[in-house]
Structure formats: C-alpha cells, structure tokens
C-alpha cells in the first residue's frame, strides 16, 4: 500500500515535470554499477556532448520503501541541459533490503562513475552529491562518510572517492535524524521499521549512525539545503542547518516564512509551475555553478 502511494506521487511529479523538459538530452539507461539486480544507474548528458563534465549524482526519494530514478527523468534532463553529466542510481528498497544497503550502493555508484569516467563523460574531480527526501538523507550520510574517516570506520564502509573530489551537496526535503522526533507518526514508524529491520530503533546502535547531524564535521562539503514551510520534515532540515552553521560549514539555505501561502509541502521543488519550485531550481543551479 505504501509503495502504491509513492507510485502515484511519482507519476504526478513525472507528469508535472514533462512540460518543462528540454530536448536534446541523451540517456544511458541501466548501466550496471554492481552485481545485484538493483545495482544499475542512468546517465544523462547533452546530445553530442564531448569529454568530461561536472557530474551530479542525484539519489531519488521515496521513504526508503518506494520511488524510482525513472520518476525524476525530466528533472535530470533539466540539470543535464545546463551542461552537467547527471547520474541517477537505483538502490534497493525496504523491507526486502535494509539499512545500510542503500548507503553501500551510493558509495559504489561514486566508485563506479570515477572508474569509468571517460566512457560516462564524468569529471571525477568535480562531483556533486544530491538527493530529495530519503535520497537527501542518503546523500548527506554518504557525504559525511566521505569527509569523516572516523565516521566511515564506525559505519564500516570505505569511501570510494577523496573528500576533495566532492565539490558540493544538494539536499531537498530530507529526513536526516530518525531520533529527532520522540513520537513519530505510525507511517514514519512503519517506514523506519522496514528500513532498519528492527522494532527497537532506540536500541539499535547501527541504525543510530543514520543520524547525520550527530556525525557531520567541519569538513562537510559546501551544501545547498531546502524544504517547504509546510513540509512535515522541515524540523529535520532546520536541525541540520543549525548544526552545519555551528560547525562553520558553507551552507546555502532556501527556507520560507511560516505563513507562506499557498503552503509549500514535501518535495515542493519539483513543482515547476509554481514560483517557489522555479526559485528552488534557480537557486540549485546557481549553487552548482559556484561549486563546480
């Protein structure tokens, strides 16, 4: 049932973005980055593009139990039209796969695109890690892993790139700390049970490592962060921003006054028929241009 909800939401996003999609974009579909059935990625770039380009690895959302890279194809086309190579991985979903499998997969994606940079038109020295919703959590966690050897050792996953290769991070409407809300909704609780594979989340030390604000360091890359004023996950974003600001991390934040109307909900950035959605895309592109 939960996946059906995400399929409907994803289809609506796909339809909404279709009218904004540019022409002249090529897609390499389902490039294997590992041995598993979910270990595939898509690569987008301008038709006829030659040589390497700054590369965005964008991890899709879906509460770890749904969503797909295909639902955001027109978003990736928009980014590729700006001259970027865009990499969109599939990752394994809960409850069939549990944490930290998707973290390992995103790390493997970074290693794969660097190992095959020439063929995929990737510039391995100019990488940006990005994501929305659950994908934003994965992007933030992997960026922490890349830039903190202590955290990488604790989580037991070896980075596949150097910290200086990761030029920036883009985070949209993410859930960064499962311990932030002491009384999560039944929906959130069910999602976290599925993703962790454990009912006692408070007692699961490994799952506690998912809490990004507790583990980021001053070496975290420059980051763009946004969420809507009516997003239920907004407190997750404000807590992360407060932590990053306290560490002195260069943070470009797009948040909105509480009385913004119409209210901006979860994943508002994909609604390009709205002024707020267009502002988010413009700010993301400006951040990318500065960083790579």
Label every PLM stretch briefly.
Residues 1-292:
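Alpha/beta-hydrolase superfamily serine-hydrolase fold, recognizing
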């Amino acid at each position: 049932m939960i996946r059906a909800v995400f399929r409907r939401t994803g289809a609506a996003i796909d339809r909404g973005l279709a009218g904004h999609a540019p022409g002249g974009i090529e897609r390499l579909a389902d490039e294997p980055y590992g041995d598993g059935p979910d270990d595939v990625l898509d690569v987008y770039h301008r038709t006829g593009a030659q040589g390497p380009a700054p590369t965005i690895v964008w991890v899709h959302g879906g509460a770890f139990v749904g969503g797909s890279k295909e639902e955001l194809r027109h978003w990736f086309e928009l980014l590729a039209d700006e001259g970027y190579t865009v990499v969109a991985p599939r990752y394994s979903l809960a409850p069939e796969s549990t944490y930290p499998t998707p973290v390992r997969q995103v790390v493997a994606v970074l290693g794969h695109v660097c190992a095959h940079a020439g063929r995929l038109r990737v510039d391995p020295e100019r990488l940006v890690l990005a994501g929305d919703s659950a994908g934003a959590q994965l992007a933030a966690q992997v960026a922490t892993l890349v830039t903190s050897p202590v955290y990488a050792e604790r989580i037991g996953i070896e980075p596949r790139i150097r910290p200086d290769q990761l030029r920036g991070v883009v985070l949209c409407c993410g859930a960064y700390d499962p311990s932030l809300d002491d009384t999560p909704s039944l929906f959130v609780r069910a999602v976290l049970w599925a993703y962790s594979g454990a009912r006692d989340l408070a007692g699961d030390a490994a799952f506690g490592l998912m809490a990004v604000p507790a583990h980021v360091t001053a070496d975290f890359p420059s980051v763009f962060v946004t969420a809507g004023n009516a997003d239920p996950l907004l407190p997750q974003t404000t807590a992360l921003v407060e932590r990053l600001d306290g560490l002195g991390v260069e943070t470009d934040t797009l948040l909105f006054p509480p009385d913004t109307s119409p209210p901006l909900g979860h994943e508002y950035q994909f609604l390009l028929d709205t002024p707020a959605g267009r502002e988010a895309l413009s700010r993301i592109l400006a951040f990318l241009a500065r960083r790579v």
